[in-house]
Each structure stands twice: as C-alpha cells, then as structure tokens.
Amino acid sequence: MDVKQHVFVAMSGGVDSAVAVAKLLEQGYAVTGIHMQTWKDPKWQAVIEDLPAPEELAETTANALGIPFVLLDIREAFYQSVVQKFLHEYLSGRTPNPCLFCNPQVKWGILQAYALAQGANYFATGHYARIEQLSSGKVRLLRGVDRFKDQSYVLSLLSQSQLSHS
C-alpha cells in the first residue's frame, strides 16, 4: 500500500485556498488545512462584529472539504515581521507590499516550518503561481498560467528550501 504524500494548505477561508485543497484531494494527497491568526484589534471589533472571523471561515471550509484543520496564533510574530516593517517603510516615504515580508518570513517561515515539523511533505497556498523542478535540483518560480491573475511576484523572495517543499 502506498503512503499518501501529506500537504498542509494555508487556508484563508476564501475560494483560492479551497480550490487548492480540492485539487490536491482529487490528486490523492492527504491534506490538512492551516490558518494563521494574525490580528485581533478590539478597536475594530464593533465595525466587523457581524462578519465571520477569517479563522471561522477557514475552519468551516476545511470541515466542508472533510480535512483536519489547525489554527496557529502567530499575532506577535506577524506584528514583528510584517506590521512593524510595513510601518517603518511607510513612515520612511516608501509604499511597501506587506506580502513581500509576510510570505517568506511568516507563511513559509512559520506555517511551512510547522507543517514540515508535523510530518508534511509539502506546503501549499492558493497563490496563482507555478514552480518547476530543474535537473540541477533547484526549483524555479514561474508565473501563473493566467498571466492576469499571476501572483508570483509576491513569492519572489522565497528561498530554494521554501520553494522545494511547495
């Protein structure tokens, strides 16, 4: 009996990550959903109180797809790695893209590391991008098939190690 490859998928509660899960399940992978809790500010609670929390959406989606779900509270790491850098850059007169901080340091830095420590073979998201395994053993990041939806630019700072487990 073949052992299934295990993939942890970062789930936002949106369509893209749900489709990624569904495609991986169709291909025969064992899948676990993972969501990172990044922000909870009481000042905004009154504004968004009628909206479901992103972690609730992600867990509901995981349950509907019949996969295990993990919620990681990474608020402090997110604040240090993303929010503070964003504010520093913004106050220095630049307009940063927070995804460029978040993806290598948080999504792949924390979530992927957690997934691999739990025995996962791979870590996936719903980003529109592709990777290619080269004969040299390196991995190359490629644009998404639909160039109008391409998100490879926000993954451009991922390391070879991070890409190789994606």
Language-model features: locations:
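ATP-dependent adenylation/nucleotidyltransferase module used to activate substrates
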Residues: 1-157
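Internal nucleotide-binding/catalytic subdomain
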Residues: 157-166
